[in-house]
């Protein structure tokens, strides 16, 4: 294989490693959780959004599921979420890594099928985001219909809006800058 496109695979893995080691993912998860505290299953929605965003930095399922399993699952169970529900949210969110560009699977498929990776990325972005949106809608409806699956956080745990806004900006800017630099 003398295709230069495959050199992107270890670079995406390295980028995911750097994002994780910098603590961007954990900050992003907790910032989104705070920002969405009024929604049913806000922590599950935050986990899904974080999975979708982190998958753009890694491009692989295993890294997303492992990291979010270590980060979000204990927090969700501690908050009183159903263990099966929390596990399903993390596993389904991790699977978004195949569809949301830049996906290593799309890169490998582009090489094998002799297609343009950029065209595959363009073709996969809408289905990936649509699937993420459908997961989020499902989780919210499921938690609304059965509140014991995902209890709302106590109101005393919610900081002032200025603190939430600052945390969201500080956690989103580095990751979005990286995504824009990579995808162009």
Kindly give the residue locations of the regions a language model identified.
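Alpha-helical transmembrane segments of multi-pass membrane transport proteins
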Residues: 1-184
């Amino acid at each position: 294989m003398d295709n230069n496109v495959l050199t992107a695979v270890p670079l995406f893995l390295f980028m995911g490693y750097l994002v994780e080691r910098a603590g961007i993912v954990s900050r992003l998860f907790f910032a989104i959780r705070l920002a969405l505290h009024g929604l049913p299953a806000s922590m599950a929605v935050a986990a899904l959004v974080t999975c979708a965003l982190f998958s753009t930095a890694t491009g692989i399922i295993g890294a997303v599921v492992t990291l979010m399993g270590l980060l979000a699952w204990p927090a969700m169970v501690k908050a009183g979420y159903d263990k099966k529900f929390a596990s399903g949210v993390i596993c389904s969110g991790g699977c978004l890594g195949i569809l949301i560009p830049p996906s290593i699977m799309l890169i490998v498929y582009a090489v094998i099928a002799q297609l343009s990776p950029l065209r595959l990325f363009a073709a996969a972005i809408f289905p990936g985001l649509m699937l993420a949106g459908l997961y989020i809608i499902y989780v919210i409806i499921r938690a609304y219909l059965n509140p014991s699956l995902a209890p709302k956080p106590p109101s005393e745990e919610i900081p002032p809006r200025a603190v939430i806004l600052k945390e969201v900006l500080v956690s989103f800017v580095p990751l979005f800058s990286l995504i824009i630099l990579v995808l162009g």
